[in-house]
A protein has these predicted regions:
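Generic secondary-structure boundary signal with a strong preference for alpha-helix termini
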Residues: 21, 32, 42, 60, ...
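Hydrophobic transmembrane alpha-helices that form the core helical bundles
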Residues: 2-81, 85-89, 94, 230-250
């Protein structure tokens, strides 16, 4: 993921084409290559945005103690997607302001677990969660690579939004590399610490894993506060991604 981030950063420094990754592909493959790159990227964003919306709904359901059917979850997910789409009508400035604020909803709990979660860390719980399906080493690595790349979907988002960025030749590479490295450190720490606090079986079943971890560390009230923060964060993230996918469609 870091190598990909570096490649995107270099492209951002050298490219003079519009359209982010599609613009990069255009140098070698022309307009058709640009369209195919953007088309494939949009397909991945459609899936990612739905996943983020479902996460927001999952945290909300857990926060309010609701029980929803798959159909009700689908309707709530569609509603969240539309709300974030409508909020983008005001343009990049409003989207940026809202996203900058809501980002703290994930920074606070994730950074918090990374720093203070070690006081509740149980090595035995962590070891039991390590490779729970007892896959051979290389099979486990192969299975995790695709999940890792999926987890870091977003390292290229600054490139996709380069037309909305001031001085993109300098700011896009900084954003891509800095954000990727920062997120990698924080999320690797937080997820590993969480795996040593709550049993793997409970984490897998939970629709609000960070809330569950904080509830285990402190109490249910703290867990609910974290769920509220994560709802805010997921909504802000979805807002940015809806903006991104619109820009990619437009440039295609």
């Amino acid at each position: 993921s870091t190598a990909l981030a570096y490649a995107f950063a270099k492209c951002g420094m050298l490219s003079r084409n519009r359209g982010g990754m599609g613009g990069y592909a255009e140098y070698a493959f022309g307009k058709s290559g640009s369209f195919l790159a953007n088309y494939a990227y949009c397909v991945s964003l459609l899936i990612a945005n739905i996943a983020i919306a479902i996460s927001a709904v999952g945290y909300a359901v857990a926060l309010f103690g609701l029980k929803t059917t798959p159909f009700e979850t689908c309707l709530l997910t569609i509603l969240v997607l539309w709300i974030c789409t409508v909020l983008n009508f005001k343009g990049a400035k409003i989207t940026g302001l809202i996203s900058n604020f809501t980002a703290w909803g994930v920074i606070i709990p994730v950074a918090g677990i990374s720093v203070i979660g070690w006081f509740w860390f149980n090595p035995e719980t962590y070891i039991s969660a390590w490779n729970p399906h007892d896959l051979p080493t290389f099979d486990a690595i192969s299975a995790s690579i695709s999940m890792t790349l999926w987890s870091f979907l977003g390292l290229e988002s600054a490139c996709a939004n380069s037309e909305s960025v001031d001085n993109p030749e300098k700011n896009v590479p900084k954003a891509v590399l800095g954000a990727t490295i920062g997120v990698a450190v924080i999320y690797i720490l937080s997820t590993n610490v969480a795996a040593g606090i709550v049993d793997n079986a409970e984490l897998v079943k939970s629709t609000a894993p960070f809330g569950l971890v904080f509830a285990t560390m402190f109490n249910g009230t703290v867990g609910q506060i974290v769920m509220g923060l994560m709802i805010m964060s997921c909504s802000g993230s979805l807002l940015s991604w809806q903006f991104t996918i619109a820009r990619v469609f437009k440039s295609s």
